[in-house]
Amino acid sequence: MQQHLYFLGIGGTLMGSLALLAKDLGHTVSGSDAKIYPPMSDLLANADITVQ
């Protein structure tokens, strides 16, 4: 069952990694963070995960 998951603090190592895992499992993923920097910003962008 596909779900839309929204991650707060998605730019961090833990939350970003969980977001990438959820995307790999077929879920729709988006999230937000106050500040996000490479390499996590690049990884999320390459996975087509929307970050606000």
What do the PLM-derived regions correspond to, one by one?
Residues 1-52:
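N-terminal leader/targeting and accessory segments in enzymes
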